[in-house]
């Protein structure tokens, strides 16, 4: 672990415009500013999905690093992967409907990569988290109504597990917050590896089954 006697966190900058990531960080008790990165790779099949997510998160972190002399940048990238490849954010309603048709009633994987960059010394850490989900067999009409609502348009795979009205997910194995877009345990582990000791909000409790996670019990509970 890097030498850091106080473990005091520098200014935290979230390199994402995602309201879900902002909500997770806020509920965990972090004080941070937001500077969305505009940098992004597009999948071309040249690298494995997990590596693609890592590269995208790192590019986002480096994209805004020059704006801060002493900050801890948090960047993340979430992708959905089915048997045919990577599904990012849909570029149109037609694409969103196609994604939902591909996923309906079938299993797929959600990968989130988190990248932390300390702008003071250039230290960088990345890690990925994966969850396996099975979608319920929704109808084409249900999918069309969901697309028409506009909710899927800013989400990888064209759905949000937290969108209760559509309620697309039948089963999840793995981290719930990973599917939302920012796995809390992965984030805390990376912050700790960089020599910082975050103090989380005492009343914070992750959504889904995260409280059953071994890492949550041993790492996050220890840092309260």
From Swiss-Prot:
Any single GO BP term: nucleotide metabolic process
Keyword S-adenosyl-L-methionine: no
Cited Pfam families: Maf
Site for Important for substrate specificity, residues: 20, 78, 162
UniProt keyword list: Cytoplasm, Hydrolase, Nucleotide metabolism
EC number(s) recorded for this UniProt protein: 3.6.1.9
Domain of life according to the entry: Bacteria
Top enzyme category: hydrolase
GO cellular component: cytoplasm
Record's subcellular location: Cytoplasm
Catalytic site: 77
Example GO molecular function: dTTP diphosphatase activity
Catalyzed chemical reaction(s): dTTP + H2O = dTMP + diphosphate + H(+); UTP + H2O = UMP + diphosphate + H(+)
Keyword Hydrolase: yes
Cofactor(s), names only, from the UniProt record: a divalent metal cation
InterPro entries documented for this protein: ITPase-like_fam, Maf-like
PANTHER family: BIFUNCTIONAL DTTP/UTP PYROPHOSPHATASE/METHYLTRANSFERASE PROTEIN-RELATED, BIFUNCTIONAL DTTP_UTP PYROPHOSPHATASE_METHYLTRANSFERASE PROTEIN-RELATED
Task of the protein: Nucleoside triphosphate pyrophosphatase that hydrolyzes dTTP and UTP. May have a dual role in cell division arrest and in preventing the incorporation of modified nucleotides into cellular nucleic acids.
Family, per entry: Belongs to the Maf family. YhdE subfamily.
Name used for this protein in its record: dTTP/UTP pyrophosphatase
């Amino acid at each position: 672990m890097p030498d850091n006697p106080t473990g005091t966190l520098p200014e935290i900058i979230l390199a994402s415009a995602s309201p879900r990531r902002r909500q997770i960080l806020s509920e965990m008790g972090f004080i941070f500013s937001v500077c969305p990165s505009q940098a992004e790779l597009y999948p071309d099949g040249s690298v494995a999905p997990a590596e693609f997510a890592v590269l995208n998160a790192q590019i986002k972190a480096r994209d805004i690093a020059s704006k801060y002399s002493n900050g801890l940048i948090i960047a993340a990238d979430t992708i959905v992967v089915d048997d045919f490849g990577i599904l990012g954010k849909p570029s149109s309603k037609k694409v969103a409907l196609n994604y939902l048709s591909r996923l309906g009633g079938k299993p797929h994987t959600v990968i989130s990569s988190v990248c932390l960059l300390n702008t003071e010394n250039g230290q960088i850490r990345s890690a990925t988290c994966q969850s396996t989900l099975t979608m319920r067999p929704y109808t084409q009409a249900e999918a069309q109504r969901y697309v028409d609502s506009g909710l899927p348009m800013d989400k990888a795979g064209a759905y949000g597990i937290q969108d209760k009205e559509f309620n697309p997910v039948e089963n999840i194995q793995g981290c719930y917050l990973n599917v939302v877009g920012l796995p809390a345990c992965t984030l805390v582990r990376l912050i700790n590896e960089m020599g910082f000791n975050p103090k989380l909000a005492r009343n914070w409790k992750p959504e889904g089954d995260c409280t059953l996670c071994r890492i949550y019990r041993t790492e996050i509970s220890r840092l309260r």
